[in-house]
């Protein structure tokens, strides 16, 4: 059987680890093929053209081939466009990568999610704290929606009853969206949930999702964190624990 070769594919490195003294195994997020595992032969050699560009959060165009579970990286070209994020923005980028590693199956294409990821990475590179938080919340929503883990945000999950614009609702991992109880913190009014649902529509831009997160930014952070931890099967993600440890120093 002929080996399939893919060329000029937009991609980002999610994770990399040693495979031999000179080579790396890469987890790559591609636009048309989803998350794929590739071996980069000789990438650790000082003379390798791969060495300076196989970095996380950097836009690449790659070529790869093979029909095994782990295919072979043939070429990689850096696309430029922004500098490497630093500080909190860099940790936030690693957080995005951890989410994708935990929640995306291999070889499952998500081109719209790829575009949202690319837009988020560019926003992280802007170094604005406010922009950073908005970008993270918007991407979390897009990710959960794209992989089918986000309930409709304009109806109660249990009854499918439309939301009342002024009533308050909470997003709960085990139950979806429900009306808030007196002791529920971080609830949002129905009108804000409805706006978020609209901003996640098939024709909505990522910038629409970012803007829709502005009114309930703090409340969304808590609820989305709980939902993501639930679906990732962990109490705290590694990158989030790293952030908390650094803040405690």
Swiss-Prot record:
Gene3D superfamilies: Nucleic acid-binding proteins, Recombination protein O, C-terminal domain
This protein's GO CC annotations: bacterial nucleoid
Keywords per UniProt: DNA damage, DNA recombination, DNA repair
Transmembrane portions of the chain: none
Pfam families: RecO_C, RecO_N
BP-aspect Gene Ontology terms: DNA recombination; double-strand break repair
Keyword DNA damage included in the entry's annotation: yes
This protein's record includes keyword Cell inner membrane: no
Top-level taxon: Bacteria
Family: Belongs to the RecO family.
Function: Involved in DNA repair and RecF pathway recombination.
The name this protein goes by in its record: DNA repair protein RecO
Lineage: Bacteria, Pseudomonadati, Pseudomonadota, Betaproteobacteria, Burkholderiales
């Amino acid at each position: 059987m002929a080996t399939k070769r893919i060329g000029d594919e937009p991609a980002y490195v999610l994770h990399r680890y040693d495979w031999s003294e000179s080579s790396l195994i890469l987890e790559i997020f591609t636009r048309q093929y989803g998350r794929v595992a590739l071996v980069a032969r000789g990438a650790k050699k000082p003379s390798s053209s791969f060495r300076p560009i196989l970095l996380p959060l950097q836009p690449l165009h790659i070529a790869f081939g093979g029909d095994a579970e782990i295919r072979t990286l043939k070429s990689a070209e850096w696309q430029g466009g922004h500098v490497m994020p630093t500080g909190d923005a860099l940790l936030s980028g690693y957080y995005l990568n951890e989410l994708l590693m935990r929640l995306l199956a291999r070889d499952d294409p998500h081109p719209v999610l790829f575009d949202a990821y690319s837009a988020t990475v560019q926003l992280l590179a802007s170094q604005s704290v406010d922009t950073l938080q908005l970008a993270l919340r918007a991407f979390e929503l897009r990710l959960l929606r794209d992989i089918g883990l986000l309930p409709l945000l304009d109806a109660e999950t249990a009854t499918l009853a439309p939301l009342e614009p002024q009533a308050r609702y909470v997003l709960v991992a085990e139950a979806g969206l429900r009306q808030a109880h007196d002791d529920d913190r971080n609830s949002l009014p129905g009108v804000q949930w409805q706006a978020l649902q609209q901003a996640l529509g098939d024709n909505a831009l990522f910038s629409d999702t970012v803007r829709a997160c502005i009114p309930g930014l703090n409340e969304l952070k808590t609820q989305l964190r709980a939902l993501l931890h639930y679906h990732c099967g962990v109490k705290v993600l590694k990158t989030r624990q790293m952030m908390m440890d650094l803040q405690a120093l």
